[in-house]
Amino acid sequence: MSTSFAELDPRINEPIIHDYFARLNQSDFIATANLFSEQGVLKPPFEKMITGRRAIAQYLEKEALGMKVFPIYIKTTMGDQNYTQYQVQGKVKTNYFAVNASWLINLNTTREIILVEIKLLESLSSLLELKHHPTFII
């Protein structure tokens, strides 16, 4: 079953946020990385920050293949004058498990992603169980 990003929550209407999740779900990791500014940062859970489009694309190709993300809720706040911040909550699914997650996404004034910070919203015991799953890397 294919669900478009917009079908999940019509209040989520920022095109760059839409494209980030849509391209990620299509496993189009180069296009996903190209939504970031040249020095944009991806901060995955339990990992060091990945900086730059090329490094982000390489990381996603290695770690996100087969994952689907389902954003459900978004809250927008103004950062300083240089960025807008979006807090998105939803799910990450693989063939083997699903977890609740949140994405903190900052867009600069030219509508490029400058930061995506991903957090898993699960209990420690649930995360430890996933750690032993062969397809989950933390």
Spans of model-derived segments:
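Hydrophobic pocket/interface hotspot
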Residues: 20, 32-33, 40, 52, ...
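Short hydrophobic/aromatic segments of transmembrane alpha-helices and their interfaces
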Residues: 38-39, 96
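A beta-strand edge to alpha-helix "cap/lid" segment located at domain peripheries
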Residues: 2-4, 57, 61-138
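A short gly/proline-enriched turn/hairpin at secondary-structure junctions
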Residues: 41-51, 66
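Short, low-complexity N-terminal intrinsically disordered segments enriched in polar/charged residues
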Residues: 1-26, 30, 34, 134-138
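Generic alpha-helical structural signal
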Residues: 14, 18, 54-57, 61
